[in-house]
C-alpha cells in the first residue's frame, strides 16, 4: 500500500500538473470506485467544469478543493491505486477505473489493479471529514509541530502492543505503513517486537527523529516501488535502492553485515537486523 512518502510524491506531482486544470467530463469504468456519491450520474454532474485547486495530503488520503464552489474530491489509493496524468489518446490499461477529461487533450486516470481504491466527491460547504469519515480517525502528521516528543511518549505510555503494530495504527501517527515503520525502527535501533510500554524516553526520542528522517529521505527518492506504485507521470520511486531493512530478507545489514531477518507481526512482514536492533536494549 502506498504510504506517506508515496502519497506525498503523488500530491506534489498533481499540484505541478493539474492545478488550474478544468474537468470537462469523465467516465466511471468501475462503479464501486465511487465511495460518495454512489450515483455515477450525480458524481459526473457535480464535478463537470470544476477546476482543480491545490492538492493536499492527509495521512494516506489525497484531497483537492474544486474551484467555482464545486466542493472537494478525495482519493485513497489503498493497495494498488495510481493517479496518472496522461494524454487522452494514451492506450487504456484494463485496470483503469476512472477518467477525468481536462483541457489540451489531457486526462487524470485512476488505475487500480486490486480495485480497493476509493474516490469521493464532497459537496460544497461541507468539511471533507463529514463524507470521508476515515479522516476523523487520523492521528497527527509526523511533520507537524504538534507531533512532539511529549505527544509520542504519551501515545506509547502503558501500551501492551509491540511498537511495530503501534506505528501502523493511523490514530497514533498518520501515514506510516509497513515499509517506513521497519526503516524507522532500524534507524533507532529498536526491535519491532518491543512493547510500547517498554521503550525508554531516549528510545522514543530516537524513534521520533528516525521516523521524520526516513520519511523525508523517502520523499526525496520519490517513494518506494516494489510492485505497483508509480508517480503521476508513471515514474517509479527509488527508495528501495537505499532501504536499510525492508525487502532485504537474508541480505547483509548495510551497517554490520548481519543477515536481515523477517518475521510476521500482526499478519505483516517485519524486517530487522538482530545485531543493530538487539532485544532488551533500553539505551
From Swiss-Prot:
Cofactor: record remark: Binds 1 zinc ion per subunit.
Zinc finger residue ranges, FPG-type: 244-278
UniProt-listed Enzyme Commission number(s): 3.2.2.23, 4.2.99.18
Record key words, sorted: DNA damage, DNA repair, DNA-binding, Glycosidase, Hydrolase, Lyase, Metal-binding, Multifunctional enzyme, Zinc, Zinc-finger
GO molecular function: 8-oxo-7,8-dihydroguanine DNA N-glycosylase activity; class I DNA-(apurinic or apyrimidinic site) endonuclease activity; damaged DNA binding; zinc ion binding
SUPFAM superfamilies per UniProt: Glucocorticoid receptor-like (DNA-binding domain) (SSF57716), N-terminal domain of MutM-like DNA repair proteins (SSF81624), S13-like H2TH domain (SSF46946)
Listed InterPro entries: DNA_glyclase/AP_lyase_DNA-bd, DNA_glyclase_Znf_dom_DNA_BS, Formamido-pyr_DNA_Glyclase, FPG_cat, MutM-like_N-ter, Ribosomal_uS13-like_H2TH, Znf_DNA_glyclase/AP_lyase, Znf_FPG/IleRS
Active site, UniProt feature: 2 (schiff-base intermediate with dna), 3 (proton donor), 60 (proton donor), 268 (proton donor)
Biological role: Involved in base excision repair of DNA damaged by oxidation or by mutagenic agents. Acts as a DNA glycosylase that recognizes and removes damaged bases. Has a preference for oxidized purines, such as 7,8-dihydro-8-oxoguanine (8-oxoG). Has AP (apurinic/apyrimidinic) lyase activity and introduces nicks in the DNA strand. Cleaves the DNA backbone by beta-delta elimination to generate a single-strand break at the site of the removed base with both 3'- and 5'-phosphates.
Similarity field: Belongs to the FPG family.
Full protein name: Formamidopyrimidine-DNA glycosylase
Species annotation: Crocosphaera subtropica (strain ATCC 51142 / BH68)
Gene name of the record: mutM
Amino acid at each position: 500500500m502506498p504510504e506517506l512518502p508515496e502519497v506525498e510524491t503523488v500530491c506534489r506531482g498533481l499540484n505541478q500538473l493539474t492545478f488550474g486544470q478544468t474537468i470537462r467530463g469523465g467516465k466511471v469504468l468501475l462503479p464501486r470506485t465511487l465511495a460518495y456519491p454512489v450515483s455515477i450520474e450525480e458524481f459526473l454532474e457535480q464535478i463537470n467544469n470544476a477546476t482543480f485547486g491545490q492538492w493536499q495530503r492527509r495521512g494516506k488520503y489525497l484531497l483537492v478543493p474544486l474551484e467555482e464552489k464545486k466542493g472537494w474530491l478525495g482519493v485513497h489509493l489503498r493497495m494498488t491505486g495510481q493517479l496518472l496524468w496522461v494524454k487522452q489518446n494514451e492506450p487504456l490499461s484494463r485496470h483503469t477505473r476512472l477518467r477525468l477529461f481536462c483541457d489540451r487533450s489531457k486526462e487524470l486516470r485512476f488505475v487500480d489493479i486490486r480495485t480497493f481504491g476509493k474516490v469521493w466527491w464532497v459537496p460544497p460547504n461541507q468539511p471533507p471529514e463529514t463524507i470521508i469519515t476515515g479522516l476523523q480517525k487520523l492521528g497527527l502528521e509526523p511533520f507537524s509541530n504538534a507531533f512532539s516528543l511529549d505527544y509520542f511518549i504519551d501515545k506509547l505510555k502503558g501500551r501492551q502492543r509491540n511498537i511495530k503494530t503501534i506505528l501502523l495504527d493511523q490514530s497514533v501517527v498518520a501515514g506510516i505503513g509497513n515499509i517506513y515503520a521497519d526503516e524507522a525502527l532500524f534507524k533507532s535501533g529498536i526491535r519491532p517486537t518491543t512493547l510500547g510500554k517498554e521503550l525508554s524516553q531516549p528510545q522514543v526520542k530516537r524513534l521520533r527523529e528516525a521516523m521524520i528522517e526516513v520519511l523525508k529521505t523517502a520523499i526525496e527518492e520519490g517513494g518506494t516501488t516494489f510492485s505497483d506504485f508509480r508517480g503521476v507521470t508513471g515514474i517509479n520511486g527509488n527508495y528501495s535502492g537505499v532501504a536499510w531493512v525492508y525487502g532485504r530478507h537474508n541480505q547483509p545489514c548495510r551497517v554490520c553485515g548481519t543477515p536481515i531477518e523477517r518475521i510476521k507481526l500482526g499478519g505483516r512482514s517485519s524486517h530487522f537486523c538482530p545485531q543493530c536492533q538487539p532485544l532488551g536494549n533500553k539505551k
